[in-house]
Regions:
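Conserved phosphate-donor/acceptor-positioning beta-strand/loop module used by diverse small-molecule
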Residues: 175-177, 186-211
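PAPS-dependent sulfotransferases, especially Golgi type II membrane carbohydrate sulfotransferases
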Residues: 1-38, 210-327
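Short catalytic-loop micro-motif centered on adjacent basic/acidic residues
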Residues: 171-175, 268-270
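Pre-Walker A (Motif I) flank of P-loop NTPase domains
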Residues: 41-43
Length: 327
């Protein structure tokens, strides 16, 4: 994405340059760590549109302690995540603690975020640099799945996930929304997986996405998030209809992609239902993982509910944009 971000959201070019250097240095080590076996654990892929509650869901999954996940620390090793996983355990895992030398690494994962960005070494990260390392997308964040199989190094992609799970000895949960339009690609690569489609009331989803544009880019006229296949047509509409169409088409793509996915590998989570009764989502996911051959040996022990933000939208422009796509 090439949009000009406001100062608090701008990339740190010095950091990115140094990370590229470090990851290049580590690659020869990483290459020797790539396993040849299939993943020993299932993956949990979080799908759906922007501002649908996906960050809350990934933070919640992280807080269960039952899943490994890309952290802000691990994300810095996007070309060497197996090595990064080992380093993370060394620095932050209580098993390797010595007189609290590095205790500040072990801060609990909060439920705070800003436009999907979290704070803290062990907070969930969206892992987009890792995904983009493999995905040969251009101006539009999409290619037909047949082209992905031709161009993506799928052997290394699968091996990286397999190796990370070997290190953590847990399933991995993470956002995979960059592949909302290529669920069949992931489904074919990972025999053991659960796809969670995050959905939200469209009106509040539209309002939240518009606010994210304003917060990160300075106004609502600039496109925010992945450029989906419908971007050329949507970009000609007013901002409210752009966002309404963006959310409509992403949800449609995910629904169509999941249509051919086996029942035990998919579930839909509505943000409002999740906030009202997260334990029900935990139980459903537990059953899906069991059907994938993995039993979560734990009972639910987190919050009974979360506060729902933006429970009513009255802005006539948002309502009109919603009707243009949803009827």
């Amino acid at each position: 994405m090439t949009e000009k971000r406001l100062q608090p959201f701008q990339r740190n070019k010095s950091l990115e340059s140094f990370l590229a250097e470090v990851n290049a240095d580590l690659w020869h080590v990483e290459e020797s760590l790539l396993p040849a076996h299939k993943p020993a654990f299932p993956l949990v892929f979080v799908m759906g549109p922007l501002r649908s509650g996906s960050t809350l869901l990934t933070q919640w999954l992280a807080n269960t302690g039952l899943f490994a996940y890309p952290t802000n620390l691990l994300s810095r090793f996007y070309r060497a995540p197996i090595m990064g996983a080992k380093l993370q355990l060394l620095l932050a895992d209580e098993r390797y603690n010595f007189r609290d030398e590095l205790k500040d690494f072990g801060q609990p994962v909060s439920f705070d975020s800003e436009n999907g960005k979290t704070k803290g070494a062990l907070a969930p990260n969206e892992f987009w640099y890792f995904w983009r390392r493999f995905l040969p997308f251009g101006d539009i964040d999409y290619l037909p799945t047949s082209e992905l199989f031709d161009q993506v190094n799928t052997k290394t992609l699968v091996a990286e996930f397999s190796g990370m799970m070997d290190v953590f000895n847990k399933p991995i949960s993470l956002k995979a929304m960059i592949l909302n339009y290529n669920i069949d690609f992931l489904d074919a690569l990972f025999e053991k997986a659960v796809f969670i489609h995050c959905k939200r009331d469209p009106l509040t989803n539209i309002e939240s996405a518009l606010n994210a544009r304003k917060r990160q880019l300075g106004d609502i006229d600039k496109w925010y998030s992945f450029k989906i296949p419908e971007y050329p047509e949507l970009s000609r509409l007013d901002p409210h209809e752009q966002v309404a169409g963006q959310i409509f088409h992403v949800n449609k793509a995910v629904e169509e992609g999941l249509r051919n996915v086996a029942e035990h590998k998919k579930m839909t989570v509505r943000y409002e239902d999740f906030c009202d009764h997260p334990e029900a989502v935990f139980d459903q996911l537990k059953n899906k993982l069991s059907a994938n051959g993995y039993d979560l040996d734990a009972e639910y022990c987190l919050a009974e509910r979360f506060n729902v933000t933006r429970d009513k939208v009255t802005d006539p422009k948002i309502v009109s944009a919603y009707r243009a796509f949803y009827g």
